[in-house]
Design a protein with these regions (language model features):
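Conserved short submotifs of the Hanks-type protein kinase catalytic core
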Residues: 175-185
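Active-site catalytic-loop/activation-segment of kinase and kinase-like phosphoryl-transfer enzymes
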Residues: 60-78, 225-281, 374
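Conserved kinase catalytic-core helix
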Residues: 187-227
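Conserved catalytic-loop position in the HRD/HxD motif
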Residues: 296
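Active-site Asp-x-Gly
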Residues: 133-135, 142, 291-292, 303-344
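Helical subdomain adjoining the active site within ATP-dependent kinase catalytic cores
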Residues: 358-363, 368-412
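Active-site activation/catalytic loop segments of kinase-like enzymes and analogous catalytic loops
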Residues: 148, 322-353, 365-384
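Conserved NTP-binding catalytic cores of kinases and kinase-like/nucleotidyltransferase enzymes
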Residues: 15, 51-172, 306, 401-412
Length: 412
């Protein structure tokens, strides 16, 4: 079973990781000196090189290959962390770093839980690659967008109760210091066969977070700082384009025997492919945006802590369509076995307070289901071919509004 929101590695990438595994680990971590930049400062940052590698995906070693010797890169080394905190004046009087370790299996970023003599907190750093698979480049400045989200949330009534607090931010190092929601767990276990699913109260809280965000973050001046064009482009590639590209290098049969043939049938459906492309164009179009949205509203971004729901990882946020957040939520409710009545109830709760395009929600949800089954970002699921066939049939029904021949071919 793969870990939460893992990346399937296309053919030709494995040799890169094997080569890195054989290389001597290089410790090139330089502790930054100087003072922390103001949280309100957004300095110009050099463009990210197109392809970067580190060995940090291998059991998360303390040593990482740093191709940017002028930059600080976070590790679990106490001297590494203590030096950063001291230089940024983030430690309280008499506070000493005692322990540090990885906080969960983060996919995109380096996330470390730090325990001191006074407290615990989370350090989260974006790097110019995907943390779990550094053969994939990623927008380096995504941490700046995430920090902006937390800062804006502080001025939106009712929103901060759903979010961990942003304690400090160093934009030059793309590093956030966040409240530690101790003993929290995400909801990726929802996909398991024995999962009881979300309680009604949990689904209500998930919908209410979106209602507060979408209704209160509509000011036109939010559009430029939350364009997030690079992250949106990255998401577009992995959601709307790569899964339906026949030469994408993904060995789907290695994931589930027979899945490759199923995907091929879907890719050759001209009407389906055209509709997905049109939806992708709408997703990318900045003129479509009406409010600030989370952008990646799936169970890996939902936490249960202190008896309630929290929402994390808004790095994919942008000024966009509220239907996108609702669609991602609905898609994952489908994939985690929630009933249509439960999904409709959630959407109805939102619709009672805000007008949305239910048909657009359905279409976006269908695309999300498709990309999670035949795309790079695989989910931690044990679904066999029959279940994946049912879900891909549902994807086609949601996207183009007709029953799919896939189910007749593979299940009858």
């Amino acid at each position: 079973m793969q870990t939460a929101d893992t990346l399937a590695v296309p053919d030709g990438q494995h040799n890169i990781f094997e080569h890195l595994a054989e290389r001597e680990r290089i410790k090139a971590i330089r502790t930054k000196s100087g003072t922390s930049l103001s949280m309100a400062a957004w300095p110009a940052i050099e463009p990210t090189p197109s392809l970067l590698y580190s060995d940090s995906h291998m059991s998360h070693p303390d040593e990482v290959l740093n191709p940017f010797p002028g930059n600080f890169f976070l590790t679990t080394s106490i001297p590494n962390i203590a030096g950063l905190l001291e230089s940024n004046a983030w430690l309280q009087s008499g506070e000493v770093v005692e322990r540090a370790g990885r906080a969960g299996e983060g996919n995109m970023n380096c996330v470390v839980r730090v325990t001191t003599s006074h407290r615990s907190f989370i350090l989260k750093q974006s790097r110019p690659w995907v943390e779990k698979y550094p053969g994939y480049s990623a927008p380096w400045d995504r941490a700046l967008v995430e920090a902006r989200f937390y800062q804006v949330a502080e001025s939106l009534p009712g929103l901060t109760s759903y979010l961990p607090r942003l304690l400090n931010f160093d934009p030059s190092e793309r590093l956030l210091m966040l409240e530690d929601l101790e003993d929290a767990h995400d909801f990726t276990l929802l996909y398991g066969a024995n999962s009881p699913g979300l309680a009604d109260s949990e689904r209500t809280q998930l919908v209410d977070f979106l209602l507060v965000l979408h209704r209160s973050a509509r000011a036109p001046e939010l559009r430029p700082p939350f364009a997030n064009a690079e992250m949106r482009s990255l998401n577009h590639e992995h959601i709307f384009a790569l899964p339906l590209r026949p030469d994408n290098g993904l060995d789907l049969d290695a994931i589930t025997p027979g899945l490759g043939s199923l995907a091929s049938d879907l890719r050759t459906d001209t009407r389906y492919s055209r509709e997905v492309a049109a939806l992708g164009a709408r997703y990318l179009d900045p003129a479509q945006g009406v409010c600030l949205i989370h952008g990646d509203y799936f169970p890996g971004s939902w936490l249960k802590a202190r008896g309630r729901i929290y929402v994390i990882d808004p790095e994919f946020c942008f000024f966009g369509l509220p239907e996108w957040d609702l669609a991602i939520m609905a898609a994952h409710l489908h994939m985690s076995g929630h009933s249509q009545a439960q999904i409709d109830n959630s959407l109805d709760r939102y619709g009672e307070s805000a007008a949305v395009d239910r048909r657009l929600i359905q279409k976006f949800a269908g695309v999300e289901i498709m990309r999670r089954l035949i795309g790079v970002a695989q989910l931690p699921v044990d679904f066999g071919l029959e279940r994946k066939t049912e879900l891909l049939c549902l994807s086609k029904t949601l996207v183009v509004g007709e029953q799919s021949a896939l189910k007749r071919r593979f299940l009858c």
